[in-house]
């Protein structure tokens, strides 16, 4: 529908920096998520894109046209809010039809278009119902249908699923993606829900303290995070302190064991770093150390099990015996390991376990948090 560019956007509220030097190009038909914790600037960025807030500096470009100073209704954008924002005195049909009526579309044309949209969103049977007669999921579907009815160049979604329950949320995010692909609408989704962003986005923009932390595809953000913030914010991540032995060769050391690890190449020799690995990538070896085959192992005691359905998460505390005599390497306080629930009974709370850490499924990063680990702070 449209190409969107945000160029060096900045925004302050008093002395507080809300958004700092934000630049992003969104391709025609792409769905990009702004993901981050509360207060990171994602909604403010969306509101500046829509025209509800003016940036202190920077520009908003749609298909090569600078719309920074245009009012909201002149930007060819549709917006869906967290709280639905439906007209309570209008039926679902009338809500969806509203934007078309304001634009003076012929009655027959707009009624046909509304009927098509209601079917697209599974609302054909509730078209004559008022908002208070609809469930939360149905109200949000009406809001989505109303937003796309005017065929906007860009669709802006501000936490659209946060007010519905988990089951409906999962259904709606699938519907949003299906609708977005079918209609080809360039879309920005603001969310704090990692699974929501990762499951339906073409790219994810991770935001932190008003700035872009990193941008990538869902797979890149999840499997290859470039910062400790992203690694910790996106799903569960183990952070294992290591020392860079040879940046030239990408070699790190843990308890005297040296391995080649992804991401270590080029890092300064002697620096502390973090070896990042997801709980599902770790492999329990029982109570005896198997052949390492270039990987690391860690010995821990199971503190608690958390049932997650098909998998169970074991929370381990590393045992001091895993350290070499005289090593200055700080221990990993805790480690999360996912195992099939069918076999979780092998490792009850209190049991000792050796875990294989496959370096091929890990990534090394340097970060100030690594320095905190080296001081024993976690």
Q: Where are the regions that the model predicts?
A:
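Conserved ABC transporter NBD signature motif
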Residues: 58-66
């Amino acid at each position: 529908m449209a190409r969107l560019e945000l160029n060096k956007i900045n925004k302050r509220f008093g002395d507080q920096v809300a958004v700092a030097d934000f630049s992003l190009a969104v391709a025609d038909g792409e769905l990009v998520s702004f993901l981050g914790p509360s207060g990171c600037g994602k909604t403010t960025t969306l509101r500046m894109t829509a025209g509800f807030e003016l940036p202190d500096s920077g520009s908003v470009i749609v298909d090569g046209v600078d719309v920074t100073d245009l009012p909201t209704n002149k930007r060819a954008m549709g917006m869906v809010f967290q709280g639905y924002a439906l007209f309570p005195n209008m039926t679902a049909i009338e809500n969806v039809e509203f934007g078309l009526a304001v634009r003076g579309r012929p009655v027959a044309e707009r009624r046909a278009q509304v009927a098509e949209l209601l079917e697209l969103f599974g609302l054909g049977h509730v078209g004559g119902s008022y908002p208070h007669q609809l469930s939360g999921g149905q109200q949000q579907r009406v809001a989505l249908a109303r937003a796309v009815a005017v065929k906007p160049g860009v669709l802006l979604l501000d936490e659209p699923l946060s007010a519905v329950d988990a089951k409906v949320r999962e259904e709606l995010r699938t519907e949003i993606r299906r609708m977005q692909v079918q209609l080809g609408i360039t879309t920005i989704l603001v969310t704090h829900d990692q699974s929501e962003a990762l499951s339906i986005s073409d790219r994810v923009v991770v935001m932190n303290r008003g700035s872009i932390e990193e941008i990538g595809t869902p797979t890149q953000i999840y499997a290859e995070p470039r910062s400790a913030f992203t690694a910790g914010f996106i799903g569960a991540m183990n952070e294992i302190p290591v020392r860079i032995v040879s940046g030239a060769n990408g070699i790190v050391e843990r308890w005297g064991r040296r391995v080649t690890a992804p991401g270590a190449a080029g890092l300064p020799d002697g620096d502390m770093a973090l070896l990042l690995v997801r709980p599902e990538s770790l492999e329990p070896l029982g109570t005896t150390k198997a052949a390492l085959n270039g990987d690391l192992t860690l010995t821990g005691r199971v503190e608690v099990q958390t049932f997650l359905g098909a998998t169970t998460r074991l929370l381990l505390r590393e045992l001091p015996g895993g350290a070499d005599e005289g090593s200055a390497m700080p221990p990993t306080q805790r480690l999360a390991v996912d195992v099939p629930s069918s076999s979780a009974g092998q490792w009850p709370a209190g049991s000792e376990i050796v875990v294989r850490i496959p370096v091929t499924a890990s990534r090394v990063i340097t970060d100030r948090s690594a320095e905190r680990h080296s001081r024993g702070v976690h």
